[in-house]
């Protein structure tokens, strides 16, 4: 079997930390206010590309530099444990990214699919590596330097897309099975309630 090509994440992308929100938060008495949608740690709940990412409203004292706003095909990584990555689709652009997150911009789309990178970063293989590098006792966080040094396995783009498609389909099937379980539990309860009356 042919060995997969690997490259460090720093060779494939640009990574920057989000904005420290307290610096831009509007004061109550401030007359200049700009309202944004902002990512929160809740934004990293299990989602797929077809859903909107959870956000909260953020009132800034002035406009925020576009480098701190999500762009299509960005991958956002939660730096506080549990470390999770989310893909930014066209539905989720222009959200403010806080300093608890890193923005990964793919600069090598000819060899790296951003959705594949998201799944790769969320894999148990990478999660185990990141756990070794977490710092802190009460609030564990990873460093951007650790992200930059991650080795990324790079199958051909076509294979990356096949992996993305498989995971998308598997997630849809899992969601459907969860819905069927919920419906079966409701039906079971209703039948039981009817029978004991």
Language model features by range: what are they?
Residues 1-33, 154-197:
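Non-catalytic DNA-recognition/assembly elements of restriction-modification systems
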Residues 9-13, 102-154:
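Basic, amphipathic alpha-helical recognition segments used for DNA target recognition
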Residues 10-26, 42-72:
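Sequence-specific dsDNA recognition surfaces
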Residues 27-36, 56, 68-70, 88-100:
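Short, surface-exposed loop/turn microsegments at beta-strand edges and helix-strand junctions
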Residues 41-42, 107:
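Structured loops at beta-to-helix junctions and adjacent beta-edge loops in soluble globular domains
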Residues 64-65, 91, 137:
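A structural connector/turn signal
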Residues 74-77:
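Generic structural signal for buried aliphatic residues
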Residues 79-119:
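A short beta-sheet element
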């Amino acid at each position: 079997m042919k060995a997969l090509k690997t490259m460090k994440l720093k060779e494939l992308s640009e990574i920057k930390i989000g904005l420290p929100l307290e610096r831009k938060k509007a004061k109550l008495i401030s007359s200049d206010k700009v309202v944004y949608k902002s990512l929160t740690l809740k934004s990293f709940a299990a989602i797929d590309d077809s859903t909107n990412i959870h956000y909260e409203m953020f009132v800034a004292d002035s406009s925020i530099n576009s480098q701190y706003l999500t762009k299509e095909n960005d991958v956002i990584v939660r730096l506080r444990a549990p470390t999770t990555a989310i893909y930014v689709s066209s539905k989720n652009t222009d959200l403010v990214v806080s300093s608890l997150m890193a923005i990964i911009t793919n600069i090598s789309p000819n060899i790296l699919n951003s959705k594949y990178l998201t799944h790769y970063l969320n894999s148990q293989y990478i999660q185990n590596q990141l756990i070794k590098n977490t710092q802190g006792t009460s609030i564990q966080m990873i460093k951007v330097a650790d992200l930059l040094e991650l080795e990324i396995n790079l199958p051909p783009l076509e294979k990356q897309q096949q992996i993305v498609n498989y995971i998308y389909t598997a997630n849809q099937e899992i969601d459907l099975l969860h819905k069927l379980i919920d419906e079966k539990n409701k039906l079971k309860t209703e039948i039981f309630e009817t029978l004991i009356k």
